[in-house]
Amino acid sequence: EIDIDQVCIGSCTNSSFTDMMKVAYILKGRKVAENVSLAIAPGSKQVLTMLAENGALADMIDAGARILESACGPCIGMGQSPNSKGISLRTFNRNFEGRSGTADAGIYLVSPEVAAVSAIAGKLTNPVKVLGDMPEFKIPEHFLINDNMIEMPASVEESADVEIKYGPNIKNVPVGKPLEDSISTQVTLKVGDNI
């Protein structure tokens, strides 16, 4: 039995509309365990809006979840870093020491269903033992498309008149010397594939 401190669901992996609907189904009418912090990052603005429109977002919030921006976040250790020696369940696609932002945290990669059930139980939990079979969640015929916050690039003609304003802390990238055609040096470190 593994007690947990934190659960993070979503980001760019395991954050589709269907994944989020499964999470909302599990959380509906339940509460996140007192000792657990649950953070959910829907995979896109469209997914977030669809969850808001059908009531699933309210189910997540009512259960005690913190809703994060649809962006990189806990996956890269930017926010929601677990406490020192804490146990965090995450639905992300990467895991290595320190990735969460806390070098000595215990990070377990799990499915959205395991994450949601465990957030309620306060410990790593098999959803099949708690819920039995999950219902099928049908993919909507039409997905919401709302790009109202995306600023399209200027045309070639318009771009000549675009002024880019830099603050005093923004500097141009230093330009180095071009690489030589041939480089001969000693290799000091070779790393494996799990970086």
PLM ranges: what are they?
Residues E1-I195:
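Fe-S-dependent hydro-lyases/dehydratases of central metabolism
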